[in-house]
């Protein structure tokens, strides 16, 4: 990313929650509905302050819980409003029913998940279990590595969600504790330039309420009978098409952002020191910084390590990831969550599923760490690199490795 401040930009030192709030303000949303929950709570406070101070001309709706949060915003979206919310953990679980309904209604809502681990045992600290638990519902999911990426991606999310080839809700996920409360340099773009980037808001969603154009929204639809046996299938197929269309749109929107603002974020995946790499580790979210340091140290020792960061997790960037990993001889995938039915991490599952279409079979190993706020340090990633290097050179059984088990 560029370290040169653009003439109309402002420089802040802020945490990820404040960065997300600034992005929502710059996107000129019409309605915000939120319910506070750790580690998202300060994001709600920033938004309330921006609205109270007149910085953001949006209506904020105070509700009794997360189920009502998304229910309220669904109605606002149907009326053509640009909307926003944020949640995590048990709050995300409480809103699951309307969360499930939102992509089915093809509503371009943007929501931040300030990721944390889930119950039980009790934990309010960082992890990816909450966001990973809803990965198959139909929302676009993008994971941020830095505070700056939180701000930039949240603004871009509106242009992605509202694109007529997509029309799906977008989750912008940043790590609880590490990004939510960790302060860093953040460049705040000019409001006029953001307005030009997003363009005129098109309130004519395909489901916008209009008394002159009546339609049935979310009617009872069966696969056998009802308004037509094929209706449900065609609707689901349309959702999948919108999701796959978003891969191209996400790439185009990130390229447009880079041209306008001079900050170039990887849209789908980021390849780091993959030239000539013998083996690679795959990361997601804020852990990537420490992982890059470990890769640099390995390269300095003469080890041909590389790294691929997944930015867009849903839809999963199969072609991009397979291409990036095509020449390596082993892969280590690091998750901050667990797929209990497979005794591995969800990102590992998706990575090996994608690699099934690769020209050659590449052995892979699952590493799980950073649960419940546990730190993933350079030393942890040096272990990941060592085990992946061993797999590349000696083969063997690719067991699941629990990184923080003896910390």
Language-model segment annotations:
Residues 1-133, 138-139, 155, 175, ...:
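Thiamine diphosphate
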Residues 13-20, 255-279, 292:
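Glycine-/acidic-rich phosphate or pyrophosphate-binding loops and their flanking alpha/beta elements
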Residues 43-46, 72-74, 95-99, 120-126, ...:
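Short acidic, glycine/serine/threonine-rich loops at helix termini
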Residues 48-53, 250-252, 256, 293-307, ...:
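Short helix-loop-beta junction
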Residues 125-169, 173-176, 200, 360-374:
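Conserved thiamine diphosphate
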Residues 170-270:
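Conformationally flexible catalytic loops at phosphate/diphosphate-handling active centers
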Residues 269-303, 316-323:
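Redox- and metal-dependent alpha/beta enzyme cores, enriched for Fe-S-associated oxidoreductases
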Residues 335-407:
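Peripheral docking tails and interdomain loops at the edges
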